[in-house]
């Protein structure tokens, strides 16, 4: 059931009510996944989740979220956000870190994500193609399927792009590389036609990571980057979008300034979940401050942003520390998950990844991949060290 949930992340847009309680198809899948897991483990005699190094910052994050529900003006709305962005995604994390201890399950999970994100990419490419044929493409509000805004589409697809690239760079079989090529062609194309400037910046950062970590591909990546950059300058729609960078920077400066003023007034607890409101240029309502760290601070306070930063940095530290010891078959997943979070870190300088139903679950699935691959690599290294020690030989 975890595979179905991961493949169906965009279906949070399917909404209905159980009486007065709103829900989504994604939330229903998450609840079914967690309940089935708990029942199965209870029958096996397991009464508590696996322990991870992230338990303390996760508890602090959940505490910060709970406080933000109390602080918020709309307690009911804040509780819904708390449930969708924190409680349920964290539950998925603990399910995943148990189930993904086996390598073949990681493979199936990534394939499920590939299938779901590829279908989503095809839908968005079809909508774009229709608009393009009709000469109706607005690069400032790119045509999308299911979602109402292009930036969330781009941010959802970024981990997919990273995992697909990881399969190409580090896949040990021809089949795996071909799957990566097909996945990258679909997810990458849909990502590009969202015309997300923050996304383009994030991809540039991922290319730098690839150049450093994949020396066999270094010359190819440098050459491909040069050709892609030169080619992009010949695409009118791309250049039209890049021409809006100066006013976008001015807009971000205004939003950041307003957010910082709000934080100064509420530095400890923030405004509570759903508390941020800003009329951009007096017309456009903004629900988040277009920066991942400002968003965490203004929504769930100083404790929340500190806890999330700790989790993020710990994931990167553990993942890259284990990288030299990771088995070749697991490198695509570790590199892709780490790369996906790097994409969000860079894109998060100018937008608010994580803060959607799909992306919050997506983050914790990437976290589970990083943890399980890194931990298995470190355990194998430890066993090898024991076997090689003089005491072991004696």
Region spans (language model):
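Interfacial transmembrane-helix termini
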Residues: 9-31, 45-54, 63-89, 98-108, ...
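Juxtamembrane membrane-interface segments at transmembrane alpha-helix termini
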Residues: 15-18, 40, 93-98, 122-127, ...
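Hydrophobic alpha-helical transmembrane segments of multi-pass membrane proteins
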Residues: 83, 96, 303-306
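Transmembrane signal-anchor hairpin modules in multi-pass inner-membrane enzymes, especially those
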Residues: 1-67, 77, 101-111, 168-177, ...
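Transmembrane alpha-helices of multi-pass inner-membrane enzymes
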Residues: 31-36, 218-219, 338-345, 353-394
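Alpha-helical transmembrane segments of multi-pass inner-membrane proteins
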Residues: 33-34, 62-70, 87, 91, ...
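Long extracytoplasmic/lumenal interhelical loops at the membrane interface
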Residues: 134, 237-300, 321-325
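A cytosolic-side transmembrane-helix exit/cap motif
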Residues: 79-80, 99-105, 129-137, 220-228, ...
């Amino acid at each position: 059931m975890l595979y179905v949930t991961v493949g169906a992340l965009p279906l949070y847009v399917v909404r209905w009510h159980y009486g007065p309680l709103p829900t989504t198809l994604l939330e229903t899948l998450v609840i079914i996944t967690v309940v089935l897991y708990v029942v199965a483990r209870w029958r096996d005699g397991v009464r508590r989740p696996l322990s991870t190094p992230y338990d303390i910052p996760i508890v602090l994050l959940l505490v910060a979220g709970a406080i933000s529900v109390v602080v918020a003006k709309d307690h009911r709305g804040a509780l819904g956000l708390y449930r969708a962005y924190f409680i349920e995604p964290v539950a998925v994390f603990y399910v995943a870190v148990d189930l993904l201890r086996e390598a073949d399950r990681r493979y199936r999970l990534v394939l499920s994500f590939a299938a779901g994100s590829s279908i989503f990419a095809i839908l968005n490419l079809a909508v774009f193609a229709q608009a393009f044929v009709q000469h109706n493409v607005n690069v400032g509000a790119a045509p999308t399927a299911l979602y109402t805004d292009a930036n969330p589409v781009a941010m959802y697809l970024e981990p997919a792009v990273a995992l697909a690239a990881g399969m190409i760079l580090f896949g040990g079989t021809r089949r795996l590389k071909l799957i990566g090529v097909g996945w990258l062609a679909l997810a990458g194309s849909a990502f590009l036609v969202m015309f997300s400037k923050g996304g383009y910046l994030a991809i540039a950062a991922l290319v730098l990571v690839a150049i450093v970590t994949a020396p066999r591909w270094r010359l190819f990546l440098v050459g491909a980057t040069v050709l892609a950059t030169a080619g992009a300058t010949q695409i009118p729609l791309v250049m039209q979008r890049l021409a809006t960078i100066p006013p976008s920077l001015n807009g971000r400066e205004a939003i950041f300034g307003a957010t910082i003023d709000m934080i100064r007034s509420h530095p400890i607890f923030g405004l509570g979940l759903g508390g941020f409101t800003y009329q951009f240029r007096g017309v456009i309502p903004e629900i988040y401050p277009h920066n991942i760290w400002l968003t965490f601070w203004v929504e769930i306070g100083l404790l929340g942003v500190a806890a999330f930063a700790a989790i993020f940095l710990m994931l990167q530290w553990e993942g890259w520390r284990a990288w030299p010891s990771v088995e070749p078959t697991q490198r695509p997943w570790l590199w892709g998950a780490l790369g996906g979070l790097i994409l969000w870190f860079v894109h998060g300088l100018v937008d608010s990844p994580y803060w959607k139903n799909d992306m919050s679950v997506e983050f914790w699935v990437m976290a589970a991949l990083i943890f399980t691959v890194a931990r298995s690599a470190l355990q194998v290294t430890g066993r090898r060290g024991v076997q090689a020690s003089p005491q072991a030989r004696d």
